[in-house]
Amino acid sequence: VLLCLLGLGCRSPQSLGRLAQPSAATTAAVSERASWVEAQLWTLTLEQKIGQLFAIRARGIFQSADDPGYRELVRLIEQFEVGGVVFFQGDPYTQAILANDLQRRSRLPLLVAQDTEWGVAMRVSRTTNFPRAMAIGATGNPAYAYAVGYITAREARALGVHQLYAPVADVNNNPFNPIINVRAFGEDPHLVATMVQAFVRGVGRAGAIATVKHFPGHGDTAIDSHSDLPLLPFDRTRLDTLELVPFRAAIAAGVPSVMTGHLALPSLEPTPHLPASLSRRITHDLLRIELGFDGLVVTDALEMQGVTKYFGVGEAAVRALEAGADVLLLSEDVEAARAAILQAIATGRLTEARIDASVSRILQLKARLNLHRERLVDLKAIPQVVSIAPHLAVSQAIARASLTLLRNEGSVLPLPDVPLIPRRLLVVSLSDSDDPATGRFFVQAIREVAPDYPVSTRLLDVRSHTDDYRSVLQTATQHDLVIVAAYVFVRSGSGRIRLPEAHRAFLDSLIAQGKPVVLIAFGNPYVIMDLKSQPAAYVVAYSGGESTQRAASQALFGQAEFSGKLPITIPGYFRRGDGLELPQVVPRRAYPEEVGMRSEQLYRVDSLLEAAIRQQAFPGAAVAIGRGQAIVWLKGYGHYTYHADQRITPQSIFDLASLTKVVVTTTAAMQLYEAGKLDLDAPVVRYLPEFGQNGKERVTIRQLLSHTAGLAPFHPFHRMGIISAEAVRQAILSDTLIYEPGTQSRYSDLGMIVLGWVIERITGQPLDQYAEEHIFRPLGMRNTGFRPVGRPDTTVVPTEIDTVFRHRLIQGEVHDETAWILGGVAGHAGLFSTAADLARFAYMMINEGRIGGRQFLKPETIRLFTTPVDPQHAGTRALGWDTKSPQGYSSAGRFFSLKSFGHTGFTGTSLWIDPEQQLFVILLTNRVYPTRDNQKHLAVRPALADLVWQAIIGPPQLNLEALLP
């Protein structure tokens, strides 16, 4: 089902793998590769062959030409002719440049490898950072594993890497394992197997080499092989039913490479302290013969103490080759290891034929990767591949789908993103390191998601003292809720994966205070086992990457769902498969690709708006674009005026003009209709008897809403000497009809002014007060409202320089003269708002009236009010709303469906919603500055709508099939 939802069709993981396999090489290509391999083997000396077995360390950071590390790297490549390098920390361009440099220096192409368990970001900055494998396991969706493998391989190849040391095929069924933990997909061997297969196929589809690790399984160990030799005291039956299951699946999926682990398994290898990586019984007999693997075998790093505590450099290299390994990874001394191998051949312990077998596999992989023809990477292509929006969108989608809510006492979550009652939040970051930046991104994300909350922050890490903990506990008493973000990660060689004791004691004391505590595990999911008491809410996020922290901040405040299922058991607390589900209730910010749109197409919005500003269609604009559950574009352009320094932002407040009609007056009418207080077919005089003058007695509410009431479009009261609110009211009430009601449609401000008075009469409240209490506050539109006249406000985007009536720049007061005479509050104009606030309103409309966990409007009410009432006489008019014109000009452009509904405002504002595509486009401008005579904006509205519609690539959800070519 999940695969179907992701647009991959209802395929099994096996069929997904078949779909993903690259096309078979032609017979000629296979023959050409084989000839090249044979030719190299024929010409290589024994010493050169041995050199091909080594993969050495390289750093993708800048190093001067005389840097000792760089010089040693070059020496090993040029003199020892090593077969490959393994890149560690670096940045994209530096690594790619160095990879090209080293390839040029090497006689044979180098096989370049890298650890990429959570993307290239595991080693290289500014690349796509994916959630850890256990997070993918929590989604239950192998399509995500495939996508991560594919994207990681694409980015790796762009940076000169061919072999990925990923995925981890270990089954993490030991809560105290200090080194695997979230690096594994879970504790169920069949889930792990499915995810491993998908990842391997994704890597292969992108043209790279996957390497499953750590054979025969590092998941149920209590020792880190970086520090010592872990022991797996299990019999063969246990290994067959647990540890070996994912490796069998990977081999069945055609994995090209396997990494053997430094693991002691007495049931398979009785020799004391002999790890699997050096054991012929395990590497050759089990992996190669019994499991039928004939690909490349790579040892885990030979510099790790799981080997070095028991074997010297030379002996370890010889034993690895005796065992059946092909690549000797990170030997501490290549020269000594090579000498030992030569000596072993001289004494008959090893044969040259044995060396040839491994070198042949290495060369075959290099040829398969086409390195014999092209070994360099194109630096100009890196920005087109690495960390691009589609890749980041996949990371974000996985992070969101993985979030696992295991405890939610008192329904403390979700928190309202716009609180009706002020609540003080304290965010405490608990770190097992000394990095002062820990938690900063999460706090920033919370402030972006919920800017109305006062948020205090504290960091407690390994440097903290007793006084620091005491101070935070005191601070917590002054807050309403505490969010604790626990950053406890797997760290090679640390030998631990637990909360530091001081952190544990602090958490227990904090929970004992009685304030609600939300604990989020950004890393080790087992940390709750260290506590004596339980927090109100416990969220497992598995990872500490930006996408995960962003997703967690959204989910805490209802902007993302909780749907992940625990892929492990937390003994005494939670079972595998546990996970409470909470839906998303308010819109979230997202990458366009997350809702079936292309970022590349939406980037053209920038060009359109910037060109319009240059052509003086308007000084500034704010745009909000949303689809499905997300806002994908929220941006300001230009300035308040052509000569001002103040820039437009999504929070800039605009005069909405006639958008007031739909956001306030029509919405209020919908609410009163649902409450049974407003009969659409009742005459207006039922609610407003004084309206029954000069033939208007039979005008209905429906006719006011559909602009078929027979009323004049407007009257220029300010030019007629009618400049008091009461005089305007009396003039409208006594006005005569200009056509028979119901026979035609003439857009009328007067009808919506009257409807505003009807709403006030029914509710007993002024229109602005009703809207604040029943529309803006429930929708979280905190910067929306009517504004009194006579109080200019320079923080509001200005409209016109009025040279006729008010004789000043209109800024912070309603532009419409009639609304201004009426005191700034009217049913047709007067509302001020932001693109961000209107996006919440539009979200509610495309979400069938639901927002914030409540039904704000019924779906059938929305359909009633947004469907044309009488195409013959009312044209495209619905109730309050306009709909898309089937022909001719439409501000909704050419492609919005005929079910689309929207409205425009005289000041240069517009809102269009397409329910078929679950799409909305909001454009706010001040095109009337400096004068209303400017009409250039009329071309911008449909052009924007067309650009947005053309960005659609599928249903409003992540479509992996469309994103992964």
Question: What do the predicted segments below correspond to?
Answer:
Residues 45, 85, 95-110, 120-122, ...:
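Second-shell residues forming the walls of enzyme active-site clefts
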Residues 603-610, 623, 629, 652-682, ...:
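Active-site SXXK
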Residues 641, 694-898:
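Short, surface-exposed loop or secondary-structure junction motifs
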Residues 10-75, 289, 310-590, 598:
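Preference for extracellular/luminal or secreted protein segments
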Residues 92-111, 140-158, 360, 364:
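Active-site-adjacent structural elements in enzyme catalytic domains
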Residues 594-656, 677-679, 686, 693, ...:
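Short, conserved catalytic-motif segment at the N-terminal edge
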Residues 350, 355-360, 364-372, 456-464, ...:
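Short, gly/Ser/Thr-rich active-site loops of penicillin-recognizing serine hydrolases
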Residues 180-181, 268-269, 381-384, 589-591, ...:
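Flexible glycine/proline-enriched surface loops and loop-helix/loop-strand junctions
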